[in-house]
Amino acid sequence: MSSAAASEPLDHAPSPALSRATVDRTGERRTDDAWLAGAWRERGRLLLLDDDYRVLADDVPEKVTGAGIGGERLAGSGPSPALHLLATEGDERPDDAVFLGADDEAAYFARRVDVLPESDGARPALLREVGSALGDRDAGLLVHAVALLTWLDRSVHCPRCGAVTEIRSAGSLRVCPVDGSEHHPAPTRR
């Protein structure tokens, strides 16, 4: 094999199931309160996650195969699951609704709820149950929502002084009110 052939990308290599995303996270918009308010009011879509980080998804088979999940149906055969996104309500974004990003169709937000609402055709599902079968947009939104809300839930206190931090930048930043330190989501290191 020549060195040129070895360095060429493999066109047939699939993307890892949970690394797909089409929504622009638009980091520059996270601190733009006027833009966030307009996006919430005019074209917002809301993803709800319960205390177990389950979401409502439409067309979820009882069993899906892929990413190490056993089942009877192969991902990609039959209708693909889709996240159940709600239209945002009200003029103001609730403080606990985090901004996930935007595309040409909508601005996407997520928030935690104690109990997911009842919905015809949708059932609660975990990321690991549906992630590999979701389309690119929904897979990216769900991975981002679970990661960001998990970080927010587990990083309440300042690691420097122990004070309760304040959520800023539409959920992508925590700031300590005592020492002013900023804390960003970061991957867990083992």
Go through the PLM ranges and name each one.
Residues 1, 10-12, 18, 109, ...:
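Aromatic-residue detector
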Residues 2-135:
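N-terminal alpha-helical interaction blocks
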Residues 85, 99, 105, 109, ...:
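Generic detector of bulky aromatic hydrophobic side chains
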Residues 86-88, 135-136, 144, 180-182:
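Intrinsically disordered, low-complexity segments enriched in polar/charged residues with Gly/Pro
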Residues 117-160:
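A gly/proline- and charged-residue-enriched helix-loop-helix capping module
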Residues 143-190:
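Cys/His-rich short segments
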